């Protein structure tokens, strides 16, 4: 049974990877990316401080009646 000639496999695989890379690059060039929207009014994006944001509050639960018996 004759042996399989693998001497050209390295070249074939290398050229295939190069071709896939080139095709991918050509597809990416044609792709249209969205532009980043310009922020026209910065005041719309400022978080408004409310009184409870600056204070630490904790809600206490009433004692359970079951635990007292």
Curated annotation (Swiss-Prot):
Membrane topology of this protein: Single-pass membrane protein
GO cellular component, one term: mitochondrial membrane
UniProt superkingdom: Eukaryota
Gene Ontology BP terms: proton motive force-driven ATP synthesis
Sites bearing N6-acetyllysine, chain numbering: 55, 58
Places the protein is found: Mitochondrion membrane
Molecular function via GO: proton transmembrane transporter activity
Residues that bear N6-succinyllysine: 55
Alphabetical UniProt keywords: Acetylation, ATP synthesis, CF(0), Hydrogen ion transport, Ion transport, Membrane, Mitochondrion, Transmembrane, Transmembrane helix, Transport
Main location group: mitochondrion
Membrane-crossing segments per the record: 8-24
Recorded family membership: Belongs to the ATPase protein 8 family.
Free-text function comment from the UniProt entry: Subunit 8, of the mitochondrial membrane ATP synthase complex (F(1)F(0) ATP synthase or Complex V) that produces ATP from ADP in the presence of a proton gradient across the membrane which is generated by electron transport complexes of the respiratory chain. ATP synthase complex consist of a soluble F(1) head domain - the catalytic core - and a membrane F(1) domain - the membrane proton channel. These two domains are linked by a central stalk rotating inside the F(1) region and a stationary peripheral stalk.
Subunit structure: Component of the ATP synthase complex composed at least of ATP5F1A/subunit alpha, ATP5F1B/subunit beta, ATP5MC1/subunit c (homooctomer), MT-ATP6/subunit a, MT-ATP8/subunit 8, ATP5ME/subunit e, ATP5MF/subunit f, ATP5MG/subunit g, ATP5MK/subunit k, ATP5MJ/subunit j, ATP5F1C/subunit gamma, ATP5F1D/subunit delta, ATP5F1E/subunit epsilon, ATP5PF/subunit F6, ATP5PB/subunit b, ATP5PD/subunit d, ATP5PO/subunit OSCP.
Record-given protein name: ATP synthase F(0) complex subunit 8
The species this protein was found in: Ornithorhynchus anatinus
């Amino acid at each position: 049974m004759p042996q399989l000639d693998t001497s050209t496999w390295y070249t074939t695989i290398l050229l295939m990877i190069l071709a896939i890379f080139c095709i991918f690059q050509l597809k990416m060039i044609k792709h249209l990316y969205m532009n980043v929207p310009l922020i026209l009014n910065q005041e719309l994006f400022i978080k408004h401080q409310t009184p409870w944001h600056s204070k630490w509050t904790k809600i206490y639960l009433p004692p359970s009646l079951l635990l007292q018996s």
